[in-house]
């Protein structure tokens, strides 16, 4: 990241084809007066995510979208890190859901592996979500941040809100999963706080350097 930060304004591309992630990003950006258009709306392709870290993959997506659209691009790479599974699925969280984005199957796979390892008690079911955010400009300038939220995994999944692995993730200090929370509760944005979810926490960091509230 450059030592000289750059502010976002005007029109930006949200470099995702994931409807749930797109909705969350638009909600987070709403107070800042930027016009957000999705990669899908611009018919942009999806680059190969060949990075070995969340941050590397976020940068790949943002840089590719900024170059293709010739607009600033905002990308997220995120996933769940299960401690008893040696960090899996990690950067492969989306791939575990397969081409049909079947996160019910992905959650079932995690639970099966946890059971095989004898991880039945809460003390053995620790996990954290990671969100890496990157903003890239067509001239190559980037700004990037990363954040996490810790919790435990429950079974069976609870709630139908959110997306992805939300219904099985119980954030630390709470008695409801992300799947049981409203988007406002999950994000934990003012007046409720400064970020509960991994994406909200990363966004707060990014907003401090790249965005001016209306």
Curated annotation (Swiss-Prot):
Catalytic residues as annotated in Swiss-Prot or TrEMBL: 77 (proton acceptor)
GO (cellular component) term, any one: cytosol
Reaction catalyzed: XTP + H2O = XMP + diphosphate + H(+); dITP + H2O = dIMP + diphosphate + H(+); ITP + H2O = IMP + diphosphate + H(+)
EC number of this enzyme: 3.6.1.66
Coiled coil region boundaries: none
Binding sites annotated in the UniProt record for substrate: 16-21, 78, 163-166, 186, 198-199
Membrane-crossing residue ranges in chain numbering: none
GO molecular function terms noted in the UniProt entry: dITP diphosphatase activity; ITP diphosphatase activity; metal ion binding; nucleotide binding; ribonucleoside triphosphate phosphatase activity; XTP diphosphatase activity
Cofactor binding note of this UniProt entry: Binds 1 Mg(2+) ion per subunit.
Enzyme class, spelled out: hydrolase
Any one biological process term the GO annotation gives: nucleotide metabolic process
Needed cofactors: Mg(2+)
InterPro entries with a match to the protein in the record: dITP/XTP_pyrophosphatase, ITPase-like_fam, RdgB/HAM1
Keyword field: Hydrolase, Magnesium, Metal-binding, Nucleotide metabolism, Nucleotide-binding
Chain sites annotated for binding Mg(2+): 48, 77
Function: Pyrophosphatase that catalyzes the hydrolysis of nucleoside triphosphates to their monophosphate derivatives, with a high preference for the non-canonical purine nucleotides XTP (xanthosine triphosphate), dITP (deoxyinosine triphosphate) and ITP. Seems to function as a house-cleaning enzyme that removes non-canonical purine nucleotides from the nucleotide pool, thus preventing their incorporation into DNA/RNA and avoiding chromosomal lesions.
Family statement drawn from the similarity comment of this UniProt entry: Belongs to the HAM1 NTPase family.
UniProt subunit comment: Homodimer.
Protein name: dITP/XTP pyrophosphatase
Source organism of the structure: Bradyrhizobium sp. (strain BTAi1 / ATCC BAA-1182)
């Amino acid at each position: 990241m450059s030592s000289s930060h750059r502010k976002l304004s005007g029109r930006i591309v949200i470099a995702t084809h994931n409807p749930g992630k797109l909705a969350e990003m638009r909600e987070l950006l709403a107070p800042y007066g930027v016009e957000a258009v999705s990669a899908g709306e611009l018919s942009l392709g999806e680059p190969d995510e060949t990075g070995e870290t969340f941050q590397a993959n976020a940068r790949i997506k943002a840089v590719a979208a900024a170059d293709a659209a010739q607009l600033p691009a905002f990308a997220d790479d995120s996933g769940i890190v299960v401690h008893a599974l040696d960090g899996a699925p990690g950067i492969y969280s989306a791939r575990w859901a397969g081409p049909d984005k079947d996160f019910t199957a992905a959650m079932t796979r995690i639970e099966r592996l946890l059971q095989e390892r004898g991880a039945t008690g809460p003390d053995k079911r620790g996990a954290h979500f990671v969100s890496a955010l990157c903003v890239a400009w067509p001239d190559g300038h980037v700004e990037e941040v990363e954040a996490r939220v810790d919790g435990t995994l429950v079974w069976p999944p609870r709630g139908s809100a959110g997306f992805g692995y939300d219904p099985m993730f119980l954030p630390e200090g709470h008695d409801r999963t992300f799947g049981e929370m409203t988007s406002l509760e999950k994000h934990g944005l003012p007046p409720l706080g400064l970020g509960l979810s991994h994406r909200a926490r990363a966004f707060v960091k990014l907003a401090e350097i790249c965005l001016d509230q209306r």
